[in-house]
């Protein structure tokens, strides 16, 4: 396949209108959309992740929307492999594809590739998650600091997913996680073009407030309540869900 294929990535903050723009462009170009919003992968997370509506999904073919369960073990490495396989297949008939979503790491995995890591036995991850759930974020932060100070100084220390990912690699290989991070860009059969959406802060905040109000009206509280038994899952440690879990437990007002 010659490198005359184009992937258009539409990026921007939550609530700015990425979905609507992606659908508008996809219709004009007669093409399909791939989501890289890691929260929208999960079929149990509906209201709180604002996926495209049923009518929007019918208007344009979407991929990676509600294709996984919160009980599946799924990470950016799995996504990269599945998405690149699909993209190569779609490019047999299409010259342009649309990538949209707010998860920058997942978008980067498609456009540039991510470092290769060994397959980790599920029991190691489960043990670390249990450790995090029982002892809290500070414990795994300190563990990472002791085992890989370089990555500790680079990672978002509030992102438990990334800390656990690093710790499982360290535990399985006996090597620092930072040693695996070569940041070497992978060869792709397509060119990537990025559209970053922006708007005035006040206007964006008003949109987000309206969006949250709509979620509440649609039954977000009920959706989160039905997922309460699974709040220990890393997938549910996300904005819009963890706040309700804290509310249910009397930890916030």
Regions found by a protein language model. Give the residues of each.
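Phosphate/pyrophosphate-binding catalytic cores of soluble transferases and nucleic-acid-acting enzymes
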Residues: 1-253
């Amino acid at each position: 396949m010659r490198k005359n294929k184009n992937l258009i990535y539409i990026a921007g903050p939550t609530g700015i209108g990425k979905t609507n723009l992606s659908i508008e462009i996809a219709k004009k170009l007669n093409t399909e959309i791939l989501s890289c919003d890691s929260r929208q992968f999960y079929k149990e997370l509906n209201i709180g992740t604002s996926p495209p509506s049923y009518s929007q999904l019918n208007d344009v073919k979407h991929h990676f929307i509600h294709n996984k369960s919160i009980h599946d073990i799924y990470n950016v490495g799995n996504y990269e492999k599945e998405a690149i396989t699909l993209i190569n297949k779609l490019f047999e008939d299409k010259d342009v594809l649309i990538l949209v979503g707010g998860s920058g790491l997942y978008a980067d995995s498609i456009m540039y590739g991510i470092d290769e890591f060994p397959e980790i036995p599920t029991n190691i991850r489960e043990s670390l998650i249990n450790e995090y759930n029982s002892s809290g974020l500070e414990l795994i932060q300190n563990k990472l600091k002791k085992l890989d100070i370089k990555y500790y100084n680079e990672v978002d220390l509030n992102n438990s997913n990334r800390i656990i990912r690093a710790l499982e690699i360290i535990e399985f290989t006996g090597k620092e996680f930072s040693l695996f991070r070569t940041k070497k860009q992978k060869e792709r059969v397509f060119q990537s073009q990025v559209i970053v959406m922006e708007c005035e802060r006040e206007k964006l905040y008003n949109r987000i407030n309206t969006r949250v109000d709509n979620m509440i009206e649609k039954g977000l509280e009920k959706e989160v309540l039905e997922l309460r038994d699974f709040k220990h899952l890393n997938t549910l440690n996300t904005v819009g869900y963890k706040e309700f879990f804290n509310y249910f437990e009397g930890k916030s007002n």
